[in-house]
Amino acid sequence: MLCLVVCCLIWLISALDGSCSEPPPVNNSVFVGKETEEQILGIYLCIKGYHLVGKKSLVFDPSKEWNSTLPECLLGHCPDPVLENGKINSSGPVNISGKIMFECNDGYILKGSNWSQCLEDHTWAPPLPICRSRDCEPPETPVHGYFEGETFTSGSVVTYYCEDGYHLVGTQKVQCSDGEWSPSYPTCESIQEPPKSAEQSALEKAILAFQESKDLCNATENFVRQLREGGITMEELKCSLEMKKTKLKSDILLNYHS
């Protein structure tokens, strides 16, 4: 593997201007070169048991020089910790068993442990924390619902409502606290009519039957009154209906045989 890396590096350097200087040596490392747009990108990889401190890549530019400060491969150091939007009480490489402390900038809250230790396998434990903004992301909008509120800074409150035909399940108001909304978001569920009891259904049927009977009585009474006002007796009405019935039958027979 080392031979392959060296051969690759020799080929890349010879492919460019012959005046290119050799990459500066870094103890306990392997150098890998890669040609990119008439330049050589060099990367230092530390051998097992060592850890890189500094910038791992160099670029050979037209000035014929390697344009970066050399890194180091040091024994027993953990990777340089990174804490965006925060501070670490360490200004250099941390040895095995060394501890560091973390603190977030104003407006941010620490998520994770406020300390970590460098282990023998060059890892950090507990894992490195992050600094999360105390402000919140826009809250979720429930299906068939919406919220009112335009600011999502820490301490802000939004209020939830549902569309017509739906009711809110959960807390109507949620508050932004240290980058998170609490309590949990509510949901909007369809309003279901409660099932009617057997007694209520029987009562409604009885009322409907009574109304129909009442309407029938009123219609009969009106019909009889109209007969009397027209001077027509029930016998005359019956005779007239029989004649119309006979005529209707004869018309049907004539149409059938024609």
Swiss-Prot record:
GO terms of biological process kind: complement activation, classical pathway; innate immune response; negative regulation of complement activation, classical pathway; positive regulation of protein catabolic process; regulation of opsonization; response to symbiotic bacterium
InterPro entries per UniProt: SEZ6_CSMD_C4BPB_Regulators, Sushi/SCR/CCP_sf, Sushi_SCR_CCP_dom
Glycosylation sites: N27, N67, N89, N95, N114, N218
Gene3D superfamilies, per database record: Complement Module, domain 1
Protein name: C4b-binding protein beta chain
A Pfam family matched in the record: Sushi
SMART domains xrefs: CCP
Keyword ATP-binding attached: no
The keyword Secreted is annotated on this UniProt entry: yes
Subunit composition and interactions: Disulfide-linked complex of alpha and beta chains.
Domain spans labelled Sushi: 18-75, 76-133, 134-190
Keyword line: Complement pathway, Disulfide bond, Glycoprotein, Immunity, Innate immunity, Repeat, Secreted, Signal, Sushi
PROSITE patterns: SUSHI
Organism, as annotated: Rattus norvegicus (Rat)
Disulfide partners: C46-C73, C78-C118, C104-C131, C136-C176, C162-C188
Role according to the record: Controls the classical pathway of complement activation. It binds as a cofactor to C3b/C4b inactivator (C3bINA), which then hydrolyzes the complement fragment C4b. It also accelerates the degradation of the C4bC2a complex (C3 convertase) by dissociating the complement fragment C2a. It also interacts with anticoagulant protein S and with serum amyloid P component.
CDD domains per UniProt: CCP
Signal peptide start and end residues: 1-15
